[in-house]
Amino acid sequence: PPPPAVPLPTFDALRVSWNAGTPPGTAVEAQARVMVDGNWTSWSSFGRWSPYLEREGAAPVTKGAVNLLPDSLVLDSKTATQAQLRIYLYTKDEHTTPSVSLVGVSVRAVDVIPAGGRPINARLHLMPYAVARRAPALQPVMDLAICLASLTNRWGADILPEEFALAMRDCRSTDAERNLSFAAAAAGCWGFPCWACWGNLALLRSEVRAGYGVIVGLESTPAQQAAGMPPV
């Protein structure tokens, strides 16, 4: 039977996250589809993932209203309210299998009034990492890798930013593009539940208040991008 449909607020973009243990010789592949104008789109794959693979995110392609990017699905002039997810498990050894602990979806809701939430005072405990002092070949994704290392090492792990950078690197994309789905999967493979989502200030404050670690990426407005600022 098909997977159950996930009811969601009206949205124009979707991102899938997964956490999985993938021993050598195994991999997982998450897929999603959405309902547009009463019909399900075709399944979109976000690439096979394992820290041991030369992994590649989705190849950018446009099918009708669906624009598939390496780590997200964006609708062009359309919206959706439902999604379906599925995840495939692969192995080269019948005695070894991947294990999946989380499959999640986040959407970019439309026509939502921004919420600020209740202010919070918190002390940030940051690791003394600097992008300029890390491996030069990995610097384009090192900012996100440092964030992941800072969060996980705060809880007792001993993971180098370079290890995260290699585990989440998307070999299909340019080094300037960060694959957030692969980044969440990299944290998950070290035992830290992690997912990527769109959020606002209210969500950020509630996560901090609850004691969770949060990495924030700010999306530039079209006007800011036209002025030369990076998209994220």
Feature roles, as predicted:
Residues 1-112:
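Non-cytosolic beta-sandwich-type ligand-binding/adhesion modules
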Residues 90-176, 228:
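Active-site-adjacent structural segments surrounding the nucleophilic cysteine of cysteine proteases
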Residues 17-19, 88, 146, 154, ...:
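Generic structural signal for bulky hydrophobic/aromatic residues embedded
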Residues 163-232:
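Conserved active-site-adjacent core of cysteine acyl-enzyme catalytic domains
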